[in-house]
Swiss-Prot record:
Catalyzes the phosphorylation of the hydroxyl group of 4-methyl-5-beta-hydroxyethylthiazole (THZ). This is Hydroxyethylthiazole kinase. GO terms for molecular function: ATP binding; hydroxyethylthiazole kinase activity; magnesium ion binding. Belongs to the Thz kinase family. The lineage of its organism: Bacteria, Pseudomonadati, Pseudomonadota, Gammaproteobacteria, Enterobacterales. NCBIfam families: PRK09355.1, thiM. The keyword Magnesium applies. The gene is thiM. Pathway: Cofactor biosynthesis; thiamine diphosphate biosynthesis; 4-methyl-5-(2-phosphoethyl)-thiazole from 5-(2-hydroxyethyl)-4-methylthiazole: step 1/1. ATP binds at residues 125, 171. Substrate binds at residues 50, 198. It comes from Escherichia coli O157:H7. Its EC number is 2.7.1.50. It catalyses: 5-(2-hydroxyethyl)-4-methylthiazole + ATP = 4-methyl-5-(2-phosphooxyethyl)-thiazole + ADP + H(+).
């Protein structure tokens, strides 16, 4: 399958839409990344909410623009709340995104993620090892880290997309986004982004938000990857290391939104 490139004009158009619609994103994400995820969404103009109580999660999924399910710090009570939210999202036609953190390394979350696939996510975002494991190609990864190159996961991503109907994102040195029939590659970013906890998880939240936008969902999701890589490059140019990267990254996201409004 040919891998196309996303144009800067497409990315800018989607960011303009993002700012106009300001999606309300219900983030059922892991404990390690909640603040960074919320700040990333805010910097881009979205509205984050972290609602985890089972009864509230179901109720909120019905009114949110989009739902994120991230299994990074999964527990049985949290799985119950996530299941309720996903069931309600399907009923309410709220697009939801799955981030199958470490799905290839741990059995409980692998079974849980496979169960959730029956509720038809709008998007799935993971590293190469996670996507390959979720597709049943291989069980791999070193915890949350990948042991495979993103390009090697393209066939698995295409299969997973066709089987689930989801837009599948494989992140790495190059991000690949596919609906099973088309594929887009997004270059850029910097290795320093892997030295900060939460950049991938925050991307999943932005992907979730983009699934709520009008237009071509594949292009919208690919645009999310492009913004994060752009902001990463800008932040690295101003940073001395991981500690100073985070505030510069959030500033860079904010600046991107200001540029498309100018």
């Amino acid at each position: 399958m040919q891998v196309d490139l996303l144009s800067s004009a497409q990315s800018a158009h989607t960011l303009h839409l993002f700012h106009q619609h300001s999606p309300l994103v219900h983030c059922m994400t892991n404990d390690v990344v909640q603040t960074f995820t919320a700040n990333t969404l805010l910097a881009l103009g979205a509205s984050p909410a972290m609602v985890i109580e089972t009864e509230e999660a179901s109720q909120f999924a019905a009114i949110a623009s989009a739902l994120l399910i991230n299994v990074g710090t999964l527990t049985q009570p949290r799985a119950q709340a996530m299941r309720a939210a996903v069931e309600q999202a399907k009923s309410s036609q709220t697009p939801w995104t799955l981030d199958p953190v470490a799905v290839g390394a741990l059995d409980y979350r692998r079974h849980f993620c496979h169960e959730l696939l029956s509720f038809k996510p709008a998007a799935i975002r993971g590293n190469a090892s996670e996507i390959m494991a979720l597709a049943g190609v291989a069980n791999g990864g070193r915890g949350v880290d990948t042991t495979d190159a993103a390009v090697n996961a393209i066939p698995a991503a295409q299969t997973l997309a066709r089987e689930t109907g989801a837009i599948v994102v494989v992140t790495g040195e190059v991000d690949y986004v596919t609906d099973g029939h088309r594929a887009v590659g997004i270059h850029g970013g910097d290795p320093l982004m892997t030295k900060v906890v939460g950049t991938g998880c925050a991307l999943s939240a932005v992907v979730a938000a983009c699934c709520a936008l009008p237009g071509d969902m594949l292009e919208n999701v690919a645009s999310a990857c492009h913004w994060m890589k752009q902001a990463g490059e800008r932040a690295v140019a101003r940073s001395e290391g991981p500690g100073s990267f985070v505030p510069h990254f959030l500033d860079a996201l904010w600046q991107l939104t200001q540029e498309v409004q100018a």
